[in-house]
Regions:
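C-terminal accessory extensions/subdomains outside the catalytic/core fold
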Residues: 134-139
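Short polybasic amphipathic segments
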Residues: 126-132
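P-loop NTPase catalytic phosphate-binding loop
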Residues: 1-113, 120-122, 141-146
Length: 146
């Protein structure tokens, strides 16, 4: 479905295994040539990308610390157990360095952002999520699938 709407779509394990190296190459190329055109990279399953591409923690840091300088914006999806409770270096890096997080759960139930004054929040409806920037929380209403 999405393959017709995006410029590059990686949908198989074979393609996934090389995409990390391709992204690093693109960042290096852009840094060298001074290219900074906007490019949104959506990674719906970070756990799969890490396991299939064998990205190291250093490579991941390079991607996130240099990608924004050349116009590359990463939107990462993953299950909560990977980033919220994972003890491996890559989920820990993500946990401490992501700028924005979207939760479809009570803020009190998550373990990696400050819970602040949200200790009494209820379970959000299925069409509500929290957008958290580490400084503020915004409640967003999203559309429901029918």
């Amino acid at each position: 479905v999405y393959s017709e709407l995006v410029k590059t779509y990686v949908g198989s394990k074979n393609e996934l295994s090389d995409i990390g190296n391709q992204l690093i190459y693109e960042i290096e190329r852009r840094l060298e040539k001074g290219i900074s055109s906007e490019w949104i990279i959506f990674i719906p399953n970070m756990r799969a990308l890490v396991s299939e591409s064998n990205l190291s923690e250093q490579q991941l840091q390079f991607m996130f610390e240099n990608g924004y300088r050349v116009g590359m914006r990463f939107i990462i999806g993953t299950d909560y157990t990977y980033i919220g409770t994972g003890i491996d270096p890559i989920p820990r890096y993500l946990k401490t360095n992501v700028q924005w997080v979207i939760f479809g759960m009570r803020l009190m139930d998550q373990t990696f952002l400050d819970k602040g004054m949200y200790s009494r929040d209820g379970v959000p409806n299925s069409d509500l999520v929290y957008l958290h920037s580490r400084k503020e929380v915004i409640k967003l209403k999203i559309s429901k699938n029918k």
